[in-house]
C-alpha cells in the first residue's frame, strides 16, 4: 500500500468517526423499530427442498419496476423460494397481485435501517427460513441477471465455502458485498448468524451500515466459516494489464463493471453505474450486446426516465 493511499485511508476513517458522532448526537427516534405494514403469503407454497431468497426492494415512486420483476422471475426459475421485502411507501394492489406469482411471502415495512434491517424483518416474518437448505440475501441495487442464471444454485453449492458472494471488497475490512450473499445450511443454523441479525439496529447513516453490518457480517461469520466470492477482486485484476489496474482498493462492481462483463460474463450491473458514474444507457447496452447478454435493456426505460428527471430537478 502506498503512503498516499494510507493517508487517504486515515482521513476517511477520521471523517467516518466525525460523521458517526454527529449522527449519534442528532439521532432521536430514528432508532425505533420499523413498522411492518403488510406480511402475507404469496400464491406460491413454500418448498423446503429449495433455498430461500430474502429480496429487499425500494423505489422512490413505490413502483415495482420491470427489471425487479425480471430478477424475481429468474430467481424463481433458478430454483429459489422468494420472500419479497419492500421498504417503499406502499405496494399497489396490482403489484401485490403480480408479486404473489413469484413469491411465497410479501412484506411491506417502514423505510428504516436499509437492507440489513429488511433482511432481519424477513427472518422474523418467515421464521421457517431455517428449514431450507440455504439462504440468499439479495436486493434490487443491481440490474440483471445479464446472462444465463439457471445454474447459479449449483455454482453456489459447489463452491468450497460456507458463505458465497458475487464480489468482495477490501474497504474497512475484507468482506463479501451484500447485494448477493448466499449462506449454506450450517451458517443459517449457527449461533453466529442468528446472533448477528438479533443485534442489527436501525442505523440511518449509510457508511456505518457498510462498516458495521456489511463488513461486520464477513468479519464475524468469517471467524468460523469459510467465505468466498465467485468473482473475487484478485481474479478480476488478473485479467487487467498491470498499468491499467487501479492503484488502490476499489469496489469492483463500480470501477470494474466493464471487464467483469467482457471477461467473466458477470451477471449483474450496479444501478449506481448509471446514477453516480453517469455511464450512458447506450454504452451499457452496447457492451451487453457485444458480449451476448440476454438482458433486455428496454425494460429500463421507465427507470432511466426517472433518473433523468431527478437529475434535471437536482441541477436547478
Feature locations, PLM:
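ER/Golgi luminal nucleotide-sugar-dependent glycosyltransferases, focusing on the catalytic module
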Residues: 1-316
